[in-house]
Amino acid sequence: MSLSRQSCGRVVRVTGRASARGLIFVIQVYRHMLSPLRPASCRFVPTCSQYAVDALTEYGLLRGSWLTMIRLAKCGPWHRGGWDPIPEGLTTGRSCQTDVDGANDDWNPASKRGERESFV
């Protein structure tokens, strides 16, 4: 079976998301049965459990688990907390690159477009 360039890794992402459902179920059990027994102490918005559900839903089992582990590593007195949503727009690999010959100017620095870098 050969995948066309149009599928662009979607089979892998769908499989990862489907396998993440079991872990999301475990997180939901924690959120609804164990978490209410403890006082609210999460220093992040969204909470770490909501972050995990969002990351697993958006990025699948492997990348979502990795993002969740990074977030949980921040949980402690050494981090001030605050607003920390899941990152948007993570690429899935070079095979899915749609920008050809610098057609996307959003990522080209001003100096490469012949513009000044600052107005001052």
UniProtKB/Swiss-Prot annotation:
Q: Report if keyword Nucleotide-binding is assigned.
A: no
Region of interest (Disordered), residue spans: 93-120
Classify the protein's membrane topology as the record does.
Peripheral membrane protein
The protein's matches in HAMAP family, at most eight in alphabetical order, are given as: UPF0161_YidD
What family is this?
A: Belongs to the UPF0161 family.
Record protein name field: Putative membrane protein insertion efficiency factor
**Which GO CC terms are listed, alphabetically?**
plasma membrane
| InterPro entries found in the cross-reference section | Membr_insert_effic_factor_YidD (IPR002696)
The UniProt entry, under Pfam families, shows: YidD
Keyword Cell membrane tagged: yes
Q: Where in the cell is it found?
A: Cell membrane
Q: Which UniProt keywords apply?
A: Cell membrane, Membrane
| Described function | Could be involved in insertion of integral membrane proteins into the membrane.
